[in-house]
Amino acid sequence: MSSSNGKPLCLIVKVKSVPGKEEELKEVLTRMIEPTRKEPGCIAYQLYSNDKNDTFFFYELWQTAAHLDAHSKTPHYERLVKERVGLVAEGGENTRLEEILV
Protein backbone atom coordinates (compact mmCIF):
# COMPACT_ATOMS: atom_id res chain seq x y z
CA MET A 1 0.00 0.00 0.00
CA SER A 2 1.59 3.27 -1.10
CA SER A 3 0.06 6.70 -1.00
CA SER A 4 -3.13 7.17 -2.97
CA ASN A 5 -1.21 8.39 -6.03
CA GLY A 6 1.25 5.48 -6.05
CA LYS A 7 4.18 7.66 -5.00
CA PRO A 8 6.28 7.25 -1.86
CA LEU A 9 4.89 8.69 1.36
CA CYS A 10 6.53 11.72 2.96
CA LEU A 11 6.26 12.49 6.66
CA ILE A 12 7.38 15.70 8.37
CA VAL A 13 7.65 15.36 12.15
CA LYS A 14 8.00 18.48 14.31
CA VAL A 15 9.35 18.01 17.84
CA LYS A 16 9.75 20.95 20.24
CA SER A 17 12.11 20.65 23.19
CA VAL A 18 11.34 21.46 26.80
CA PRO A 19 13.45 24.54 27.64
CA GLY A 20 16.91 23.50 28.85
CA LYS A 21 16.59 19.98 27.38
CA GLU A 22 17.56 20.81 23.79
CA GLU A 23 20.90 18.97 23.70
CA GLU A 24 19.53 15.92 25.48
CA LEU A 25 16.61 15.71 23.05
CA LYS A 26 18.94 16.21 20.09
CA GLU A 27 21.02 13.22 21.25
CA VAL A 28 17.92 11.02 21.64
CA LEU A 29 16.63 11.98 18.19
CA THR A 30 20.04 11.56 16.54
CA ARG A 31 20.21 7.94 17.76
CA MET A 32 17.16 7.20 15.57
CA ILE A 33 18.89 8.06 12.30
CA GLU A 34 21.20 5.09 11.66
CA PRO A 35 18.82 2.23 12.54
CA THR A 36 15.91 3.88 10.75
CA ARG A 37 17.88 4.35 7.54
CA LYS A 38 18.52 0.58 7.55
CA GLU A 39 14.81 -0.26 7.71
CA PRO A 40 13.12 -1.80 4.67
CA GLY A 41 11.27 0.84 2.70
CA CYS A 42 13.14 3.84 4.13
CA ILE A 43 14.16 6.11 1.25
CA ALA A 44 15.20 9.12 3.34
CA TYR A 45 15.37 9.95 7.04
CA GLN A 46 16.92 13.30 7.91
CA LEU A 47 16.94 15.40 11.07
CA TYR A 48 16.94 19.21 11.01
CA SER A 49 16.70 21.92 13.67
CA ASN A 50 15.57 25.52 13.65
CA ASP A 51 18.02 28.38 14.23
CA LYS A 52 17.34 28.33 17.99
CA ASN A 53 18.02 24.56 18.23
CA ASP A 54 14.84 24.14 20.27
CA THR A 55 12.65 22.61 17.57
CA PHE A 56 13.59 19.59 15.49
CA PHE A 57 12.14 18.30 12.25
CA PHE A 58 12.40 14.83 10.75
CA TYR A 59 12.01 14.57 6.99
CA GLU A 60 11.00 10.98 6.25
CA LEU A 61 10.35 9.37 2.89
CA TRP A 62 8.95 5.82 2.79
CA GLN A 63 8.24 3.50 -0.13
CA THR A 64 4.79 2.65 1.23
CA ALA A 65 2.47 3.42 4.13
CA ALA A 66 3.06 -0.14 5.36
CA HIS A 67 6.78 0.58 5.69
CA LEU A 68 6.03 3.73 7.67
CA ASP A 69 3.62 1.83 9.92
CA ALA A 70 6.24 -0.89 10.51
CA HIS A 71 8.72 1.81 11.57
CA SER A 72 6.57 2.65 14.60
CA LYS A 73 6.87 -0.95 15.82
CA THR A 74 10.68 -1.17 15.76
CA PRO A 75 12.72 -1.46 18.98
CA HIS A 76 14.52 1.84 18.31
CA TYR A 77 11.21 3.68 17.84
CA GLU A 78 9.78 2.15 21.02
CA ARG A 79 12.97 3.21 22.85
CA LEU A 80 12.53 6.77 21.52
CA VAL A 81 8.98 6.93 22.88
CA LYS A 82 10.32 6.13 26.37
CA GLU A 83 13.45 8.32 26.19
CA ARG A 84 11.65 11.45 25.01
CA VAL A 85 9.51 11.66 28.16
CA GLY A 86 10.36 14.91 29.93
CA LEU A 87 12.27 16.22 26.91
CA VAL A 88 9.48 17.03 24.46
CA ALA A 89 7.18 20.01 24.90
CA GLU A 90 3.59 19.94 23.74
CA GLY A 91 2.86 21.19 20.27
CA GLY A 92 4.59 18.53 18.21
CA GLU A 93 3.15 17.69 14.85
CA ASN A 94 3.17 14.86 12.30
CA THR A 95 2.21 15.74 8.74
CA ARG A 96 1.82 13.10 6.02
CA LEU A 97 2.36 14.47 2.55
CA GLU A 98 1.65 13.00 -0.85
CA GLU A 99 3.39 14.17 -4.00
CA ILE A 100 1.13 15.88 -6.49
CA LEU A 101 1.45 14.37 -9.94
CA VAL A 102 1.93 16.89 -12.73
Predicted segments with their positions:
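Short, surface-exposed ligand-recognition loops at beta-strand->loop->(often short) alpha-helix junctions
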Residues: 16-22
